Amino acid sequence: MIQMQTVLNVADNSGAKKVACIKVLGGSKRRYAGVGDVIVVAVKEAMPNSKVKKGDVMKAVIVRTAKEVRRQDGSYLKFDDNSAVLISNQMEPIGTRIFGPVARELRARQFMKIISLAPEVL
C-alpha cells in the first residue's frame, strides 16, 4: 500500500537507488497504490554516471509491497520491502535487469517485459 511521500527501493539497474512517490495514477482522488499499479516518482538517491539523476520525475510500477496482497485463491503474499521498477512513458522498463522477486500480479497488468527480466516470480 503506497501513497504520496512513500520512499521505495528501486529494483532495477537504471541507476536510481531510492524514489519517492509523488502521485498515484488512476483516478482524481486515488490515495493508495498496490502491486502492479503505476505511480509518478521523484528520484531521491541515484548512482553517479547513471541513466537517471537525482531530482528526475519518472513513472514507476510497483513490484513488491510490505502490505500483503490477497490472491483469488485466498492466499496472501507480502514482501520485506516496498520496491518499484522505473518505466518509460511507453510502459517499458528503463533498466535492463531486475533485482529480487516480483509478484505474479504484474502479468495481469501486461508488464511482460518485467516478468521476463525478473529472476523469480512469486
From Swiss-Prot:
Coiled-coil regions listed in the entry: none
GO CC terms in record: cytosolic large ribosomal subunit
Keyword Mitochondrion carried by entry: no
Gene Ontology biological process: translation
UniProt entry keywords in alphabetical sequence: Ribonucleoprotein, Ribosomal protein, RNA-binding, rRNA-binding
Any one GO molecular-function label of the UniProt entry: large ribosomal subunit rRNA binding
Function: Binds to 23S rRNA. Forms part of two intersubunit bridges in the 70S ribosome.
Quaternary structure and partners: Part of the 50S ribosomal subunit. Forms a cluster with proteins L3 and L19. In the 70S ribosome, L14 and L19 interact and together make contacts with the 16S rRNA in bridges B5 and B8.
Family the entry assigns: Belongs to the universal ribosomal protein uL14 family.
Record's protein name: Large ribosomal subunit protein uL14
Organism of provenance: Syntrophus aciditrophicus (strain SB)
